[in-house]
């Protein structure tokens, strides 16, 4: 998520695609006059300046997590560019002598990462824990948290596709212990 959010910032690769696809209504509200483009700012197809307004992820989420076609559109804009950047960063780190790379993302399997990953691990939590955490840490309502979860593949899909599973319903210490066990097993 961090990399995707980084690439959604004004001037980054994903930003203009999202503005073109979803319009100015997905941008943060501002008191700035946006009637005339300022030098260096992106401009939409209808000639409006984005005035370097950040994408409002809540507004965008309200659109895509209630419409599978719009979610697919967002994913088609962002995911190829995120994957390209991940691969670039991996190569950069390989050149620096690094040997372990961890990619944390919701759609690794769907976006074809299995072909570049030696092992895949599914970290999951009970439904009530997931909803509670989304509400607490991201400020979601229960309805929005459920909509996000409903937009994802089934738990069985991930359990079947991954080499390792970690139950993250409990404490962070237990999750770290399970992860260490996996890393030890992989001799990392």
Give the ranges of each region predicted by the language model.
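Anionic group-transfer/hydrolysis microenvironments
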Residues: 1-3, 106, 112, 169
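Small-molecule kinase domains that catalyze NTP-dependent phosphoryl transfer to phosphate-bearing small molecules
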Residues: 85-86, 94, 115, 136, ...
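Residue-level signal for inorganic ion chemistry
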Residues: 1, 74, 102, 166, ...
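An amphipathic alpha-helix signature
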Residues: 15-19, 83, 127-135, 142, ...
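ATP-dependent small-molecule kinase phosphotransfer cores
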Residues: 5-98
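Short beta->alpha linker loops
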Residues: 55, 77-78, 125, 149-153, ...
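Short, acidic/turn-prone active-site loops that include or flank metal/cofactor-
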Residues: 2-4, 126-128, 172
């Amino acid at each position: 998520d961090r990399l995707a959010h980084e690439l959604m910032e004004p001037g980054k690769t994903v930003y203009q695609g999202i503005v073109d696809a979803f319009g100015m209504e997905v941008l943060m509200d501002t008191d700035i006059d946006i009637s005339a483009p300022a030098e260096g700012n992106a401009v939409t197809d209808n000639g409006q300046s984005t005035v370097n307004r950040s994408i409002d992820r809540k507004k965008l989420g309200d659109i895509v997590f209630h419409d599978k076609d719009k979610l697919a559109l967002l994913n088609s804009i962002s995911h190829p560019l995120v994957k390209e950047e991940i691969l670039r960063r991996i190569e950069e780190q390989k050149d620096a002598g690094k040997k372990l790379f961890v990619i944390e993302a919701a759609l690794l399997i769907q976006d074809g990462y299995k072909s570049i990953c030696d092992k895949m691990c599914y970290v999951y939590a009970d439904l009530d824990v997931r909803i509670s955490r989304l509400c607490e840490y991201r400020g979601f309502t229960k309805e929005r948290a459920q909509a996000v979860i409903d937009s994802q593949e089934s738990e069985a899909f991930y359990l079947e596709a991954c080499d390792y599973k970690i139950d993250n319903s409990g404490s962070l210490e237990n999750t770290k212990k399970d992860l260490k066990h996996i890393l030890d097993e992989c001799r990392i």
